[in-house]
Amino acid sequence: MVITGFTFFTAVVVTTVQLFFERRDETRRAQQLNTLTTLFFSEIGDNLIRMLNQCDRANQHLSQTLPAPEEWTEAHFKSLASALRSHRVDIDPLSADTEALRKLLASSLLFRLLEAPHVFEHDLFNSLLRTMFHLRGELATHPDLTVLKQHKLDHLANDITKIYNPLVKLWLEHMNYLARFYPALFHSLLENNPFKPPAGGNNGGNTAVL
């Protein structure tokens, strides 16, 4: 009985220690992924959202529902998230700044992110990066979109939509994570969020999602 009790106690201790290290590893992975996601949006993602907003015929309708406060709060973010989730993008490739888009998609950071194990394991992030590489190839193949036939423009519109929707979904997911664990960084990024109208501007423009 003593041996049995000791064995049971040892098993419980070992299991507890294993759980501790597993949770610690999960926390570390989440923190590392968060750092990479912050870097992505800082260097590429936010600007990409702004560029793709310019291609969205439905953006004017969306912008009328977005908050436009002088100082953004978490409540404004929740209103923004709600508006984005119910929005449907309507992409016009001919409205895109293709040169700026090509330059952004040529960033070496995309390759480094795709090689990062934590990004590879994140289905949404990994899929988004691969879709961005696909669009990069399409734009390289078609330097002048104005000469394309409608079926090819429709194909490009679909490619851009496949980027825009998960891109904004990842942005919302990331901002929710920051709001929970890094509120100071969350509020800092919220003040400069890619859906915020330019200073002195109105809420008109282009956007869409989920």
Predicted regions and their residues:
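Membrane-embedded hydrophobic alpha-helical segments
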Residues: 1-23
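A broad, structural surface signal
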Residues: 2, 35, 39-42, 46, ...
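Secondary-structure capping and boundary motifs in well-ordered enzyme cores
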Residues: 4-8, 33, 124, 128
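Membrane-proximal, non-transmembrane interface segments of integral membrane proteins
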Residues: 26-108
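Soluble C-terminal extramembrane regulatory/interaction domains of multi-pass membrane proteins
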Residues: 97-207
